[in-house]
């Protein structure tokens, strides 16, 4: 199946539109000059206006003065490392924690071979890939929230 839509030039209505110069809207707008000269600058200037507006309305406050001799009670990594930190913190054997983290890329490499019989690209028609994605997303969010809590409340998220 081709991704290009070819015009049916035997259609008299389409030939009449093309004769009047009205046919390009039927197949899509040209990128030059419509997108590059009109739409892109509006999006770029709008993004800059949003960033400047947020910086003016809610400036970043300065935190406490740095003291190299005072160590905080609990040192947390950057936010994108919270799930990894939680795995290493909860698993009793650190080697097992590292092995669990190597299973994630291995599972992602195996997933296309499990789902190769499915020819659909729509994610709602690929139940295995969708369920693995949703499970991984919820597990990552769960581990990330648990990393922000004390160790005794991290597995139950303080709910029980």
Curated annotation (Swiss-Prot):
Pfam families, sorted: Cytochrom_B_C (PF00032)
Location of this chain's protein in the cell: Cellular thylakoid membrane
Biological-process GO terms, alphabetical: photosynthetic electron transport chain
Transmembrane segments: 36-56, 95-115, 128-148
Annotated membrane topology: Multi-pass membrane protein
GO molecular function, one term: ubiquinol-cytochrome-c reductase activity
Keyword Transcription: no
Coiled-coil boundaries: none
InterPro entries: Cyt_b/b6_C, Cyt_b/b6_C_sf, Cyt_b6/f_cplx_suIV, Cytochrome_b_C_euk/bac
Keyword Membrane on entry: yes
Keyword set, alphabetical order: Electron transport, Membrane, Photosynthesis, Thylakoid, Transmembrane, Transmembrane helix, Transport
GO cellular component: plasma membrane-derived thylakoid membrane
Family recorded in the similarity comment: Belongs to the cytochrome b family. PetD subfamily.
PANTHER family per record: CYTOCHROME B, CYTOCHROME B_B6 C-TERMINAL REGION PROFILE DOMAIN-CONTAINING PROTEIN
Assembly behavior: The 4 large subunits of the cytochrome b6-f complex are cytochrome b6, subunit IV (17 kDa polypeptide, PetD), cytochrome f and the Rieske protein, while the 4 small subunits are PetG, PetL, PetM and PetN. The complex functions as a dimer.
Function in brief: Component of the cytochrome b6-f complex, which mediates electron transfer between photosystem II (PSII) and photosystem I (PSI), cyclic electron flow around PSI, and state transitions.
Protein name, per record: Cytochrome b6-f complex subunit 4
Native source organism of the sequence: Prochlorococcus marinus (strain MIT 9301)
